[in-house]
Amino acid sequence: MASESKDSPSNNPGLHATPDEATKGYFLQQTMFRIKDPKVSLEFYSKVLGMSLLKRLDFPEMKFSLYFMGYEDTASAPSDPVERTAWTFSQKSTLELTHNWGTESDPNFTGYHNGNSEPRGFGHIGVTVDDVYKACERFESLGVEFVKKPLDGKMKGIAFIKDPDGYWIEIFDTKIIKDAAGSAS
């Protein structure tokens, strides 16, 4: 008799085998990063990673703006601002960039904690690309800062880059991730 998969509930205490029916339809919609300068961050996420701006929301009384980035085709987005907001919040896996006004020009603002130094917390987001090596060559030509290049370290074929605020982004392709996963126990 074959042993159960490591992914099975019996091998993962606390994991429910069947999600509660009340959660049917739930999905992960966004991850939020606080950013210092929207001009710099929007250029990075659109030019370097190829994301589109799905929706911008400004909150003048509270002095902040939200920029929702993603890989959706914005040609299908409604033109009505309220409908476009609803459309944006119906997309899967968006990145919400939160800009608190004034940080871009504040000489005393030192940036946000990215979670990868003490005290550790949040680690990174991940982006799938067609070919990790070609993508990283392009990133290098664009002057992107690397944490790890695909040939560095023990896990070959996986890279980590930094966005302008120091947040880590894992870069991988599905072929190489299959090979890397094959070495896991």
Curated annotation (Swiss-Prot):
It comes from Solanum lycopersicum (Tomato). Pathway: Secondary metabolite metabolism; methylglyoxal degradation; (R)-lactate from methylglyoxal: step 1/2. GO terms for biological process: response to salt stress; response to water deprivation. Binds 1 zinc ion per subunit. The active site is at E170 (proton donor/acceptor). Zn(2+) binds at Q30, E96, H124, E170. This is Lactoylglutathione lyase. One of its GO terms (molecular function) is lactoylglutathione lyase activity. PROSITE patterns: GLYOXALASE_I_1, GLYOXALASE_I_2, VOC.
